[in-house]
UniProtKB/Swiss-Prot annotation:
One of its GO terms (molecular function) is metal ion binding. One of its GO terms (cellular component) is cytoskeleton. The keyword Metal-binding applies. Belongs to the cytochrome b5 family. SUPFAM superfamilies: Cytochrome b5-like heme/steroid binding domain. It comes from Pongo abelii (Sumatran orangutan). SMART domains: Cyt-b5. Heme binds at residues 52, 83. The gene is CYB5D1. It comes from the Eukaryota. Its main location: cytoplasm. This is Cytochrome b5 domain-containing protein 1. Pfam families: Cyt-b5. Keywords: Cell projection, Cytoplasm, Cytoskeleton, Heme, Iron, Metal-binding.
Length: 228
């Protein structure tokens, strides 16, 4: 991806989005591309899956690839839920799907390697961002080409983050002025902060289909000397 030329803002070559939608997480549902979400965060476990490829302990994780697994965790401790093991009477991790990577065996075992450091669910090593608790749709219209695209975005995403989502449709999106109802958008603000209200609850209250009215952002091309 080329740099942004004369347009003010972050260098999109290194730009990192903060939020991911559940639909985006769901797309990463294979052992070679494995994401999960839990407790409001999104994690890329692809490297973990590659490191334990062929290991039976990976099976419960592969089965939930692309899904939210918050129910595996105690929200207070952010650790795997625990229970009293009926066989040993000891407090152990609760794994209804079966024991998985980094969970100790039920009984003492001499061949269990515990030199991996922190378990994969502790710390932020695999974290790639936050899970959008609420999403909304927004239309983006390129006034130069009359092309229109509808994106699902997180309500807490800035316009810069929405622009980053839009890049697959227009690699020069940063060379445009983004406007709503004739006013320039503050690219560091969210849609709501820019006056683009989320009216989903009002439509629900009125028993109306909210998809019939999706706000539109208009893009106006700037000749900023970037490559066309």
């Amino acid at each position: 991806m080329s740099r942004r030329g004369l347009v003010a803002g972050p260098d999109l070559e290194y730009f990192q989005r903060r939020y991911f939608t559940p639909a985006e997480v769901a797309q990463h549902n294979r052992p070679e591309d494995l994401w999960v979400s839990y407790l409001g965060r999104v994690y890329d476990l692809t490297s973990l899956a590659q490191a334990y490829k062929g290991n039976l302990l990976l099976k419960p994780i592969v089965e939930v690839a692309g899904q939210d697994i918050s129910h595996w965790f105690d929200p207070k401790t952010r650790d795997i839920r625990k229970h009293i093991d009926p066989l040993t009477g000891c407090l152990r991790y609760c794994t209804p799907r079966g024991r998985f990577v980094h969970v100790p065996p039920q009984l003492p075992c001499s061949d269990w390697a515990n030199d991996f450091g922190k378990p994969w669910w502790q710390g932020s090593y695999y974290e790639v961002g936050r899970l959008s608790a609420k999403t909304r749709s927004i239309r983006i219209i390129n006034t130069l080409t009359s092309q229109e695209h509808t994106l699902e975005v997180g309500v807490l995403e800035s316009i810069w983050e929405i622009l980053h989502r839009y890049l697959p449709y227009n690699t020069h999106a940063a060379s445009y002025t983004w406007k709503y109802e004739g006013k320039n958008l503050n690219m560091d603000f969210t849609l709501e902060e820019n006056g683009i209200r989320d009216e989903e609850e009002e439509f629900d209250y009125l028993s109306m289909d909210g998809t019939l009215h999706t706000p539109a952002i208009l893009l106006y091309f700037n000749d900023d000397l970037t490559e066309l």
